[in-house]
Amino acid sequence: RNSQHDYDYIIIGSGFGGSVAALRLAEKGYRVLVLEKGKWFSEKDYPKRNWNLKRWLWMPLLRFFGFFKISFFRHVTILSGVGVGGGSLVYANTLPLPKKEFFTAKSWAHLADWEKELTGHYQTARQMLGTVPNPELQTGDVALQKLAKNLGKENEFEPTQVAVFFGEPDKTVPDPYFGGKGPDRAGCNFCGGCMTGCRIGAKNTL
C-alpha cells in the first residue's frame, strides 16, 4: 500500500467551498487532497480583455482553456470558475453584507436566528479576503449615488466593499495580510479587469 496517496478527505473543487473546507480540515491535522480540473493561473496568464476568448472562457470542445465557465440551463445560467481558486477567480470581488431583511425572510427565518448564526462567519471571510471599502468612486458609483439621492436613500449609499489590495498602484509588496506567509500583492491600478483576471496581483483570491 502506498501511503503517499492515502488521504483522510478528498475535496473536489478549489473555490469558495472547497478551499475553505480543505484549509479547516488541514488545520485539524487531516491529510487532505484537493482535486481541481483547471490549472494554476498566474497574473501573466490572464487576458487583457474578454475578447480573447481562448484565454478567458472554459470551452474545451472549442479548445478554449480559460478560467471563466458559463453553464446554460432551462431556467438559470451559472457563471463559475475553472482553475485553482474556482469561483474566486471570476467573482467581481465585491463582498457586501446582507441587509437585515435577508436574515428575516419568511422562507427561512423560522429555522434559526440567521443573523446571529452567520455574522461571525461573514467577518471571518471578510478578514481572510482582505475586504476594504473601494477608495475611489468611479462613474458607475457616482450614478448609483445620484439614484439613491433621487430615491431618498442617499444615507444608504456606501462605497463597495471589495477584496482588493489598495497599496501604491502597480507596486508589488510582500504579503500584507498573513505575516508574510501569503503571496505578494500589488496595489490596484483601477483597470477594471476584475472579472477577466487581475493581471497585477491586487485582487485577493483563494
PLM region spans:
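Conserved redox-cofactor binding core of oxidoreductases
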Residues: L111-L206
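N-terminal glycine-rich phosphate/pyrophosphate-binding loop and immediately adjacent elements
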Residues: R1-K106, H110-K116
